[in-house]
Amino acid sequence: MKAWHWSVTLVVIYLAIPVILYLLTRKDDRKPLSDIRKRKRTIVLVLGDLGRSPRMLYHARSLARSGHKVDLCGYDGAKPFDEILNNDLIKIHHIPLILNTRKLPFVVFGILKVIRQHWLLISLLYKLRGADYLLVQNPPSIPTLGVVRFYNLFLSTRTKVVLDWHNFGYTILALKLPETHPMVKFAKFYEGFFGGRAFVHLCVTVLMGQAMRKTFGMSGRRIVPLHDRPAFHFKPLSESEKLDVLRDFKETLYDDMTADHKIIVSSTSYTPDENFNILLDALALYDESKLDLPPLRVIITGKGPMMPEFLAKVEKLQLKRVSIRTAWLEFADYPRILGAAHLGVSLHESSSGYDLPMKVVDMFGCGIPVVSVDYAALSELVKTNTNGVAVKGHVEMGNTFMSLFSNRGKLDNIKRGAMIESRNTWDQTWVKTVGPLFDIGEYVQQRPDEDYDFSSSSSDDDH
């Protein structure tokens, strides 16, 4: 059989599966009149580690604080913060993690994994059908968006789907494959086709909202930018609290330090979209400088697939006045480590150019200024010489370190800007911007299409 015959057959089978399931599971999911005064219920879904999905945890917390029942769905892994675990209105549903325990070939395992994920997600959402809202993180796009569309069409038609766009899934795939690769093209089509039909689209930057209109033809009236903001547990530390942190972690992170040391902190997932060579080369320039500079203690938090490569490069550097420590921290300890630092560093290089690094938001929440690798959307968060410095390459980063730590006035200036950022919290932003979408509070701002120039002449009827 010709290759295109196989392709057509697979497409027909894929489209037939939801129809068959619909016929087998169809029920009237409308609320009876006796239920209309009950609490509203929202499903918060992320096909990822819940404990490492802070923005979705913040959504769940905000919804519960506003009186919604929340079904929080995702992988078991890192421990979420206590206000999630101890909230009677939040029920956690763990999605089983699919591992390649049989050592199958990559392609074979990938196909079987996606099929299994379809079944797990459909089964979970069928059990939770009838919710008022379904709030979904994207990416990952496949198979999440297709399953969510099926759920909304066939299992729970009354549910309003809200997609929270953190990035574009197809651009992440394009880090590994050429943009012209058939898989990247399919991923882009899939993301636009299934993702474009939501009730509302949240996105992390204004620039991303504009790209969603241009790339996927979405209506600007349904796009609401929601910048990440620091949650309640990220806050500036007093001098006594900083001393407590230095004492509590003296044996592991702050050993052999003097009062002259300056502390830099960075968080990384050790993945290709974060080039840690920029930081290491910048630190090498700082170390080689003939200027009278203070010694540095650099704390790198996080874990990921490229961590062994990073540690090997650190070992080769043999720096004299720069020492590097790595750590994987508990949720409660991470804000404390940030708050004790003099400067934060972000190595995030966006695959799309449209998202923003959550780590910078966390650092601002703790009142520490940030040096960040520059890209298109970064200016929506980092304002050079106001709350941080945007740099291109290791030379600019190294020179920035030297400038800030040899001129206290410059560091103090951006420190003041970071402290101002710490006052603009997630709770304040969420209630004003997102709350009304979930029937919480009242609109207090302009329509998104007017405020951000997202106006569109396209019809919303098919959304």
Swiss-Prot record:
Residues 25-105 are cytoplasmic. It is a single-pass membrane protein. GO terms for biological process: dolichol-linked oligosaccharide biosynthetic process; protein glycosylation. Residues 106-126 dip into the membrane without crossing it. Its main location: endoplasmic reticulum. It catalyses: an N,N'-diacetylchitobiosyl-diphospho-di-trans,poly-cis-dolichol + GDP-alpha-D-mannose = a beta-D-Man-(1->4)-beta-D-GlcNAc-(1->4)-alpha-D-GlcNAc-diphospho-di-trans,poly-cis-dolichol + GDP + H(+). Pathway: Protein modification; protein glycosylation. This is Chitobiosyldiphosphodolichol beta-mannosyltransferase. It comes from Yarrowia lipolytica (strain CLIB 122 / E 150).
